[in-house]
Amino acid sequence: DVLGSRGLGDVYKRQIIGWGQYWNIIESNHPLFSITGTFTNPGPYGAFLGIALLIQIHFAWHKYIAKQYMSLFMLLIVGLLTGSMFIASFSRAAWVALLIAVSFFFFLFQKKRYRYAGLLLLILFLFSSPFLYQLKKQSADGRLFIWRVCTELIQSKPYTGGGASSFAARYMYAQADFLEKHPNHEYAAKATNNIYAFNEYLRIACEYGLPGILLYVTIWLHGIYCKATYCDRLRKLLLIYLAVFSLFSYTFQVLPLAVLCIVLGAFQNNNSKFTFYAFPMRYLVIMLLLMTIIAWSGTRSSQYEKKEILFTAKQLYTQQNYADAKEYLEKAAYLSPTSEILMDLGNSYFHLQNNAKAEHCFRIACNMVPGRILPQYYLFRFYAITMRNQEAITLGQSILFGDY
């Protein structure tokens, strides 16, 4: 309860920011989304609001059992405000996670009428799934396409994976390879640059292989699947919520959510039958928090390094210092490739008279995002300048009559 109370306090602060963005008092952190809270997009914000609602439901139930109706009334008022912002966040992943977590909330009771309520909620989820899909169909199709490409990454290195934090470095090349093999894929014209798997389980499998995903799932099950005498109800519900949310988002790439997962996994009742906690729990929690923060800091440092490399590359490229720009663009293309980076790298190679590598970069950029004209134009211009007229004509006709 103490953990829940402190968590609610933090979420309430974020909720106030959300209402400020809703009324255009506070500026959003994303040009395409009006409500993002303290985050850069609505996904993590919706996750935190869902956590708040789940905690409120837990507290409200206990107030109802204890017949503390005044406290229950206050919780319902606060829950109404939180629920309104939760819906406004438009985070479908958080909606699904909350619905399933609340269903399990009722399944935890012994009385059949409560379990029937949980079953009804699960049935509601099944019937509402098509509506949630159609609500933002293009976004849903995009995630399905990303997951399809992720399976290609997993198949390429099923046992070892690509290594820690390798997803961003490998994904766009895998997407380019997939769309080159399947040029008529229904999502080819809509494909964009991307660095997220939108599924923590797939990301872990891509980076650490089958052993990594087995360990990851085992850790989740260890935290969730335990008897009521060994773990408290709220902790289990929050873990279920985060486990479901991780199916559609990037939970462990948002520091507050990653820390919350670690803390919830570490907290066990003193009567736990597991005996590997040989020293005080607070020390274990501190160690886990430090490990999470260090790992996240390393990721942030890597992201900062990528931005610095890309910024330097862009400056040198704009100044037409192609020899030096090439060095930085090669690093950027290795760490976090995009079609823009490959186009600039291709142009740098071209100006340095390395036509083979220039064509290779332009082709990859075209395959990464087949629905964009600019990569096609650069390849067309390359063919025209190098006097490869037939290829230039063929590509030019494709650009003129293509569906862009």
Feature-to-residue mapping (PLM):
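Alpha-solenoid helical repeat scaffolds
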Residues: 310-311, 340-344, 373-381
